[in-house]
């Protein structure tokens, strides 16, 4: 077994008291393994524990945070006549869902489709009948495997014949085994007691995984096999692992997954760790938990690492294309002071000092240099939140002194609170270009700063109780509700797994899984954008929305004031295609009115 590469991230300097130490470590983990759909609710809940850190807004009740998780269904209608099961009564018939909000903010902007502004849904409307399929039957040209997902793969006819039996570790003639590591940490009890309902229930999440797996077993062509999920109690401390500690525990758990016959592992992303994922690869077990890692990391562990979230490299591309195509060489018209709005933009970059963010920050700088943009200032900060106020003050003072008009904040979910407070204190009101940690997180940041913020990786967020993941659960378990509030993560993770299993064909191996994924055509447009793979693509999202923060808009997530609203009429932009940011060298169509 190959030695896991220890993460270079240093442990946080914990203040006195085990509760503060645990909270700071867990918040650092959320920052490292950021997934906006999950992290924002957890971060806001866990900030309750940081009473020793000055200036942090108290989180709302945990029960309210559950509604803030962003697990929303895009509006659209599904045809019940095209839904078919493959021998299971669980399948049910697809219902009809009334059209909901277009996802716009106070100015009525609708989310769109690539190259087309104002498209009112996110691509989940029923496809034409000629392109729908009945799972497991004969396939017509252009048919999809099923009609209930915009991400449905091409139809595969029902398989009859010899599937080759045990074609790979974790595969038999009748089963494909996935494992799930139940998290273990000496500090888990503290995390659970403070976070309350906002902390994911591992057993509830596993239950939802099992529900989706049972349904997908009837919908995808698995060539005589079916997926089984085996859970085991982890030995390693997942919080310590992501700080470069207890690496032997991660190795032991990867060995356990292998001994259980794992072909792949579907551990929840926040209770996985980079060392565990790397050790799974050393055991030749696929992992579906990585989050925010650069493309180079996925390449180095191919074909074993997969994720439903965009790579850090794709996020860097979004920063570069936004700056180079729509901001550089023009006045900082979205800044908060009149004097700054008349100045040509000068950019400053902020990133945490852990290796993953530093690597992504380097990719941003390289891309900017390619289009002739030099940073006026670049700063890193630690994830020691006990020093957050001091570091925020220092960073904003440096940016202000160097005339930075536009802050590129490739930041974790917490530090923008402190940066904004420090900027206010110094009467410094720049433009902000930031990741999107969803509306509830944005509501925690001073609106005098965030009302000048642009997000480079947005998603449409229709009203709660809607979305493809919820609809699929209704089909999987009629009359029941998902057990875990983060069920959408379970849904899209299992969807990715099953797409690869079907595309691999009967001779299932890690290599054929990767080859099958590479062969899949691009999907339609859904809540997570358009999915596409191709060679050396291990994360499917290809596009995103540019958004602006409207402090007056009502959020679809928590019904409070403050929400992200689409720029440019809701046009989707493609990470790798700078031309999709058109009209180039013109100000973004953000705010009301722009400029």
Positions of predicted regions on the chain:
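Extracellular/periplasmic ligand-binding modules, especially the Venus flytrap/periplasmic-binding
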Residues: 412-418, 460-521
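C-terminal region of N-terminal signal peptides and the immediate post-cleavage residues
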Residues: 45-73
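Extracytoplasmic ligand/sensor domains, especially the bilobed periplasmic-binding protein
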Residues: 137, 259-378, 431-456, 461
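Extracellular/periplasmic periplasmic-binding protein-like sensory domains
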Residues: 309, 422-492, 587-591
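Solvent-exposed, acidic/polar segments of extracytosolic/periplasmic ligand-binding ectodomains
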Residues: 140-145, 150-165, 521-595
């Amino acid at each position: 077994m190959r030695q896991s590469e220890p993460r270079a991230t240093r442990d946080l300097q914990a203040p006195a008291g085990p509760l503060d130490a645990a909270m700071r470590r867990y918040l650092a983990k959320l920052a490292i393994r950021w997934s906006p759909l999950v992290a924002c609710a957890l971060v806001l809940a866990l900030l309750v524990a940081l009473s020793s850190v000055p200036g942090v807004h108290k989180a709302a009740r945990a029960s309210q945070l559950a509604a803030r998780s962003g697990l929303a269904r895009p509006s659209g209608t599904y045809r019940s006549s095209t839904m078919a099961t493959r021998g299971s009564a669980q399948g049910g018939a697809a219902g009809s869902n009334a059209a909901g909000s277009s996802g716009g903010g106070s100015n009525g902007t609708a989310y769109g489709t690539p190259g087309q502004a104002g498209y009112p849904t996110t691509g989940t409307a029923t496809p034409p009948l000629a392109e729908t399929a009945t799972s497991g039957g004969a396939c017509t040209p252009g048919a999809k495997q099923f009609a209930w997902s915009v991400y449905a793969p091409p139809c595969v006819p029902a398989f009859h014949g010899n599937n080759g039996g045990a074609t790979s570790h974790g595969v038999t003639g009748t089963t494909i085994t996935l494992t799930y590591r139940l998290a273990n940490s000496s500090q888990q009890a503290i995390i659970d007691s403070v976070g309350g309902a906002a902390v994911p229930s591992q057993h509830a999440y596993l239950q939802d995984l099992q529900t989706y797996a049972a349904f997908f077993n009837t919908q995808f062509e698995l060539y005589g096999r079916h997926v089984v999920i085996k859970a085991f109690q982890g030995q390693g401390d997942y919080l310590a692992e992501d700080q470069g500690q207890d690496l032997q525990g991660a190795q032991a758990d990867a060995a356990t997954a292998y001994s259980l016959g794992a072909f792949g592992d579907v551990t929840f992303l926040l209770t996985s760790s980079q060392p565990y994922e790397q050790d799974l690869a050393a055991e030749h077990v696929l992992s579906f938990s990585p989050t925010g890692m650069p493309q180079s990391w996925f390449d180095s562990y191919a074909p074993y690492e997969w994720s439903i979230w965009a790579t850090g490299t794709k996020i860097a591309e979004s920063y570069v294309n936004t700056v180079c195509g729509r901001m550089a060489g023009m006045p900082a018209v979205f800044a908060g002071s009149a004097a700054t709005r008349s100045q040509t933009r000068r950019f400053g970059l902020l990133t945490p000092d852990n290796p993953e963010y530093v690597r992504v920050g380097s990719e941003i700088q390289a891309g900017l240099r390619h289009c002739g943009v030099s940073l006026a200032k670049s700063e890193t900060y630690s994830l020691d939140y006990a020093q957050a106020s001091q570091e925020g003050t220092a960073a904003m003072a440096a940016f202000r002194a160097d005339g930075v008009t536009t802050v590129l904040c490739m930041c974790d979910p917490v530090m923008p609170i402190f940066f904004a407070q420090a900027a206010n204190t110094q009467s410094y009101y720049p433009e902000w270009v930031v990741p999107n940690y969803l509306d509830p997180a944005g509501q925690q940041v001073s609106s005098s700063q965030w009302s000048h913020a642009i997000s480079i990786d947005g998603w449409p967020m229709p009203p709660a109780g809607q979305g493809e993941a919820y609809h699929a659960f209704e089909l999987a378990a009629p009359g029941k509700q998902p057990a875990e509030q983060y069920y959408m993560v379970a849904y899209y993770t299992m969807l990715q797994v099953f797409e690869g299993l079907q595309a691999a064909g009967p001779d299932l191996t890690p290599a054929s899984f990767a080859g099958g994924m590479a062969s899949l055509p691009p999907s339609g447009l859904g809540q997570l954008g358009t999915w596409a793979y191709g060679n050396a693509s291990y994360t499917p999202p290809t596009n995103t929305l540019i958004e602006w923060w409207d402090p007056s808009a009502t959020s679809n997530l928590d019904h409070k004031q403050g929400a992200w609203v689409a720029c440019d009429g809701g046009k989707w932009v493609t990470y790798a295609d700078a031309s999709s940011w058109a009209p180039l060298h013109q100000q973004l169509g953000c705010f009301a009115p722009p400029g």
